[in-house]
Structures are given as C-alpha cells and as structure tokens.
C-alpha cells in the first residue's frame, strides 16, 4: 500500500523559486528529494523527542508508524512544493527554505495544539551521503524558529475535500473475483470462512458485509476513513464477516458515478495506511 511508494525525485536543475510578497525569492535547492531518508540524516533520538512533544498516541514498536508517517508526509510535501513554488507564497508551501535551512510542517500538534516542525540544516560531515541533517522537532513558539519569516503549512492530500466523505448515493462495485480469489487477500480472511466447502458461504458473507458497511457509513459518515494511495484518495469501510466486530477493511475508490472496491486490508494495515494522512478517530480502526 502507500508505504511502497518512495521514488526519488530531484528538483530540476533550473531550480524552483517561491515568489515572496515583497518581490524577493527563496531558492529551493537541487539537493531536495522526495525520500526523507535520502534527503537528510535523521538521528534516532529525534523521534523520541517528537513522541514526547506531540499529543500522545501509539506509534508502534520502535516508532515504526511515526517514521512511515513522516516519510510519507515529507514525500507529499516535496511534491506540493515543487508543483506550487512558482504560484504561491512560502507560507502556503509545506517546505520553507530560509538562510540555508529547511523547515517542514510535520502535520502533528502538541497537547495544546501548536504546530510541530522538523528543522533541517546542511550536513557538514565529510563524505556524508545525505546533504541535510535533521536538527530536531520544534513547536511553533520555540525560539529556534524565530529566524523564519514564514512557517510552512500542513501537507494536504485531497484536492477536493468532498473526496474525504462517503457519498451514500453512489453504489459500490466489488471485484469479487480478485478480493476472494487473490492469494494475498485470502490470507486476511477469517479461517472459519476458508476452504472449498465454504466458498459459497464466504461470497455471501462478503456481499452482505459490503451492504451493511455501506448502510452504516450512510448513517455515520465518519465511519469511512480516508487513505492516500496511487495519488488518489480512497476510503476504508469496516467489514463484519462473522461477528459484529470488524475483521477487514474494504478499500473503495470513487469513479464516475460509483465506488470501485478492489481489495481488503487487515485492520492493522488499514490503520497504518490511514495514519499516513491523519490520526483516525473512529472506534473501529483506532489502536
């Protein structure tokens, strides 16, 4: 899913510049690339500092979910900065370069809802693979950020906010042959529904679960949780196949006049993907 998308993208040699209101320009260096860990050396203690600074949540073993989140957000930030640098002010970009330093809006908040930023400085270590060094994470009121005239904005994933909300008027078309026939998908289905003798039972359970999920999402739109995959917003719906407790998450993508469902995820996979955008608050997917 989204964590597989990590291609290296470098800014064109002409270099991009962001127009400032006063007519000045801020140069975006050619060393910028979309892979956070190719862009900068990130010391492990910085992650622990961020966990302490941010509003508490479960980031998994060794902060694995946090690292995936930062990597995914940074990649999107590079894309948006490249795309919009010549069209908007630096305060509307998720990356700001000022006086040889780089500031990144993590999208995370402190307990008192201050924005948290990642501060990068040039890597002065000889023969360093990465051109930048993660100085640390700082809240917006921290003196370390006073020198920045502009603070970067949050990364956004949906160009149209309506994509984030389930439209109950649209039918769901499921690729049943793939969902119930693909070997990888089958490993996620409850064992009690597996086996040749249960193929009809599995299909009926799946079809019924999809109908029920759509009705529940129509009654409560917050039940549909967004994720970002393949450059598009998808929604995750809970599937209850054998009990009232969700066992799988159905991924649906809006097409022209309907939602296409092509795969199912485990609840853990669904949470990890959804957390790349924001912390899910709906109960069925919360850690």
PLM feature spans:
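Compact beta-sheet-dominated globular domain cores
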Residues: 232-287
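An acidic, glycine-rich, mixed-charge low-complexity segment common to nucleic-acid enzymes
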Residues: 1-230
């Amino acid at each position: 899913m989204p964590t597989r998308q990590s291609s290296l993208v470098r800014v064109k040699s002409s270099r991009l510049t962001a127009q400032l209101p006063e007519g000045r320009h801020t140069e975006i260096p050619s060393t910028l690339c979309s892979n956070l860990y190719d862009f900068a050396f990130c010391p492990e203690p910085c992650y622990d500092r961020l966990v302490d600074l941010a509003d508490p949540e479960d980031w998994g073993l060794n902060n694995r979910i946090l690292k995936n989140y930062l990597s995914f957000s940074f990649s999107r930030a590079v894309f948006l900065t490249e795309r919009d640098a010549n069209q908007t002010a630096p305060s509307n970009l998720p990356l700001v370069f000022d006086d040889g330093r780089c500031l990144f809006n993590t999208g995370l908040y402190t307990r008192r809802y201050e924005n948290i930023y990642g501060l990068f400085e040039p890597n002065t270590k000889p023969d360093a693979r990465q051109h930048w060094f993660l100085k640390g994470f700082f809240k917006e009121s921290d003196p370390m950020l006073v020198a920045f005239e502009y603070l970067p904005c949050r990364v956004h994933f949906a160009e149209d906010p309506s994509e984030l909300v389930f439209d109950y008027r649209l039918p769901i078309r499921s690729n049943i042959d793939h969902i119930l026939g693909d070997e990888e998908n089958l490993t996620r289905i409850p064992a009690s529904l597996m086996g040749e003798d249960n193929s009809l039972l599995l299909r009926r359970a799946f079809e019924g679960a999809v109908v029920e999920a759509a009705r529940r999402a129509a009654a409560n739109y917050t039940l549909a949780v967004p994720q970002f995959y393949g450059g598009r917003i998808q929604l995750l719906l809970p599937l209850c196949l054998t009990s009232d407790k969700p066992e799988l998450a159905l991924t649906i993508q809006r097409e022209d006049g309907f939602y296409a469902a092509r795969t199912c995820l485990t609840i853990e996979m669904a949470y990890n993907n959804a957390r790349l955008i924001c912390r899910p608050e709906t109960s069925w997917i919360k850690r």
